[in-house]
């Protein structure tokens, strides 16, 4: 019959060609949906997350250390007070020293409290993003914002530490060509508290500067 003779061969060809065309279509669709989408998604993630996981953990650690040092500076200065007696021209006079008697020390307390609050806020935000496995710095605008904040507070801590250092140095050395003595001899505990507070103040400044440098590196690597 013609069905058995002539029509059978074209049917076989169709049966053979259909799977080949289907395999080719599968290969094309796999190429379009697989490597291309994966490559673009990875590029976006890399652009949004220029830092690795370790760098983000280091960013959070810097915030935590800044909180500790700024709170320590605040605590030591806030507890700096002492009463004693001092000899001037042979007269024993009672003296009392307290951090609130100096505007420089009050300024250091205020700046340290502001830095502690700023660092705590940034730590909470960074920790929440880190636990959700999201980028700690989500965008360039956020990076610029925290960079500006870190710069402002770092300069404020420098000025507070410098002002407090001047007053402390005057207390330790006295005033030349006058009878004013070294006030830190009878007020040793007070001066020690102030010195430790100033040390933690400059340490906080260094940590803020390190955070700012990390944010500059992030801005230089990010594209979005």
From Swiss-Prot:
The keyword S-adenosyl-L-methionine does not apply. The chain crosses the membrane at residues 60-80, 107-127, 143-163, 193-213. Pfam families: CASP_dom. InterPro entries: CASP/CASPL, CASP_dom. It is found in: Cell membrane. Residues 81-106, 164-192 are extracellular. NCBIfam families: A_tha_TIGR01569. Homodimer and heterodimers. Belongs to the Casparian strip membrane proteins (CASP) family. This is CASP-like protein 3A1. It comes from Populus trichocarpa.
């Amino acid at each position: 019959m013609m069905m058995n003779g002539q029509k059978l061969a074209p049917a076989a060809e169709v049966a053979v060609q259909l799977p080949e065309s289907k395999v080719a279509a599968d290969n094309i669709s796999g190429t379009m949906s697989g490597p291309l989408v994966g490559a673009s998604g990875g590029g976006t993630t890399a652009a949004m997350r220029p830092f690795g996981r370790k760098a983000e953990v280091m960013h959070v650690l810097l915030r935590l250390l800044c909180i500790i040092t700024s709170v320590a500076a605040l605590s030591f200065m806030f507890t700096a007070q002492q009463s004693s007696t001092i000899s001037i021209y042979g007269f024993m006079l009672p003296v009392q020293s307290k951090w609130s008697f100096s505007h420089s020390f009050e300024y250091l307390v205020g700046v340290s409290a502001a830095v502690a609050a700023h660092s705590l806020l940034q730590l909470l935000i960074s920790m929440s993003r880190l636990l959700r496995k999201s980028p700690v710095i989500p965008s360039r605008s956020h990076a610029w914002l925290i960079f500006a904040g870190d710069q402002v507070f770092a300069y404020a801590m420098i000025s507070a530490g410098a002002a407090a250092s001047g007053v402390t140095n005057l207390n330790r050395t006295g005033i030349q060509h006058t009878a004013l003595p070294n006030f830190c001899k009878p007020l040793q505990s007070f001066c020690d508290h102030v010195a430790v507070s100033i040390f933690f103040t400059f340490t906080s400044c260094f940590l803020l500067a390190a955070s700012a440098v990390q944010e500059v590196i992030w801005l230089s690597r990010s594209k979005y």
